[in-house]
């Protein structure tokens, strides 16, 4: 690439910060980072990072530009890549499409969704039919421990591939994905791979996320205790995983036979790890249940796969979102005399 | 009855206190009450009661005798009735059979289980095969607002019937149940009925308890909000109720077609009522999930009725009990290297 890629990166948690660092220090990208809660701190002092791959004691790191809102695309300065690392909460406006809209140059900006869940590309492709939409599945362990300070303690492995979009030729999208892999890997420290089979990668990750994230959130329980109790694995986690596996199969994705046993044991036991959705509810944050529980359930339904456990998990996580929304003042539940259940 | 019945009453919450009051003031029973948390207060000052049926401002009420532990049966002073109004937590020792054992005179004491749930009689009949075991289903609204102080704000309606026991002739058990109805009603203020069909009464109440109690507990949500959200009713409460109804049917109990719609709407909407199991978990108390969720599920399984929703509710409530037990110091979950899920 002759000139540096003009990258807009939205979302500044652990994943977003480490992506900003890798892209900017690789030298093949100028990163404009859109920050929220940590905007002031990072504008003044830069990020502080302890990283298992980039080194400890990094201070004062700033990308090319730091903004506190999504900029509008300007002529001659279009963003080549718009990387989204925010939570994906489609049940709340503004949703991801709303958030990125001002920055998108139709037919040009490549939209990279570095987010969990199924069918996250659907509303993006609908809104931006002429832009390539790229799947990013990150396996990084990185946490923002206080505003602007990130502890990156597990390797940054990410898989970048193509979401099929009717109006974008596949070779254009593939080239865009491979270019993103190139600029991400330019720092020489991380392991970003081109992903030939995005549905496989996403369904594989859902085996963990749909089960452990939802059940940990409903119970506020770490995954070590689930394995200690055994019954949480036997009566909740495994039945949920088996439904996701069956839905994947019906969608043409054949996951390995031992995938559930592998995912059941994938977390270390000495850290009493709480999955991210559980961390979110404990902080009072909205939860990403629609793409992590709702979409696999709906996909299964379309394909004729019975998912009674997922339906129940969906019912509970949607009810928890209702409570979080009330606590945040986004809704004010009031009893009405003409209610459906009056 | 020539002489007064010698009644032992174990459990001193709202239900237990109002039963003590009705039995003692009716004049056909001498009640020995076994109290725990409120023993000291009530020994000194008696109970304070505001009652929708017995009157407001009752103070200093004491039954014939107040004890702080279950007494041993003494020759010539056997208890005619042992009434149990404690929570029923069979997964913890001492269980109900353990608790009442010292007071039971084999072949004589009639054991009245004024408790919720299915199959609560099974361990009692096993331990005390020669004693009549009586079912009590109470619909009272009574709450102990502070130790020894009870607000009784909804009518005391109870149904008393027979649990079949192989070694106790049915006519003996029926006579015992009817005698209990007589001494309970003697105060002239309450509505205690002989129940011809205990399975019907218990399964009917389970339609509410298995669904609303478990789901409210898992979500810490009142039933008014569930009806406001609608989706909690549609996606959780009704599916659970339908499984209980199907299980009841397989057990030979035909509940009315409209039972679910009736139970969905049975609570007032202006009180934002949290079912008792939800109140328990919010107080850090152990929960009665085995007889309210586990037994209907196991009964359904035996009868070939699929209950995927109940199985999931059971998984969650059992996991919550695990957390409550840990918080109470009853268990100390530790990861072991040779664990099943290592």
Range-by-range predicted roles:
Chain A
Residues 1-59:
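NAD(P)+-binding Rossmann beta1-loop-alpha1 motif at the extreme N-terminus of oxidoreductases
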Residues 5, 29, 109-110, 131-132, ...:
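A structural micro-motif
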Residues 34, 52, 66-69, 136, ...:
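Conserved beta-strand termini and adjacent loop/short-helix elements that scaffold enzyme active sites
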Residues 35, 116-117, 293:
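Helix N-cap/beta->alpha junction signal
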Residues 99-104, 127-132, 145-256, 261:
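Internal alpha-helical scaffold of NAD(P)-dependent oxidoreductase catalytic cores
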Residues 59-151:
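Rossmann-like NAD(P)(H) cofactor-binding subdomain of soluble oxidoreductases
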């Amino acid at each position: 690439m002759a000139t540096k890629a003009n990258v807009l990166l939205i979302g500044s948690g652990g994943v977003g910060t480490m992506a900003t660092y890798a892209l900017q220090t690789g030298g093949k990208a100028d990163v404009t980072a859109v920050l929220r809660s940590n905007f002031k701190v990072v504008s003044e002092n830069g990020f502080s990072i302890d990283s298992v791959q980039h080194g400890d004691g990094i201070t004062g790191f700033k990308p090319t530009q730091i903004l506190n809102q999504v900029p509008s695309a300007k002529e001659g300065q279009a963003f080549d890549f718009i990387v989204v690392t925010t939570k994906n909460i489609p049940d709340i406006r503004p949703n991801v499409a709303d958030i990125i809209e001002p920055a998108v140059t139709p037919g040009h900006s490549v939209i990279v969704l570095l987010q969990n869940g199924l069918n996250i590309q659907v509303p993006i492709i609908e809104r931006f039919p002429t832009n390539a939409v790229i799947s990013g599945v990150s396996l990084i362990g990185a946490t923002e421990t206080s505003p602007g300070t990130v502890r990156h303690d597990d390797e940054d492995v990410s898989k970048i591939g193509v979401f099929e979009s009717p109006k974008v030729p596949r070779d254009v999208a593939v080239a865009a994905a491979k270019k993103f892999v190139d600029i991400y890997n330019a720092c020489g420290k991380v392991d970003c791979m081109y992903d030939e089979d995005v549905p496989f990668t996403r369904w594989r990750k859902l085996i963990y996320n749909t089960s452990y994230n939802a059940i940990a959130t409903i119970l506020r329980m770490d995954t070590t205790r689930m394995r200690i109790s055994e019954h949480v694995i036997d009566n909740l986690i495994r039945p949920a995983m088996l439904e996701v596996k069956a839905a994947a199969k019906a969608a043409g994705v054949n996951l390995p036979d031992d995938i559930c046993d592998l995912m059941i044991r994938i977390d270390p036991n000495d850290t009493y790890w709480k999955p991210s959705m559980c961390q979110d509810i404990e902080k009072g944050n909205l939860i990403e249940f629609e793409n992590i529980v709702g979409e696999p359930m709906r996909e299964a339904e379309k394909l004729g796969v019975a998912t009674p456990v997922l339906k129940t998990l969906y019912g509970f996580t949607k009810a928890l979102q209702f409570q979080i929304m009330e606590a945040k003042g986004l809704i004010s539940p009031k009893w009405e005399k003409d209610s459906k259940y009056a």
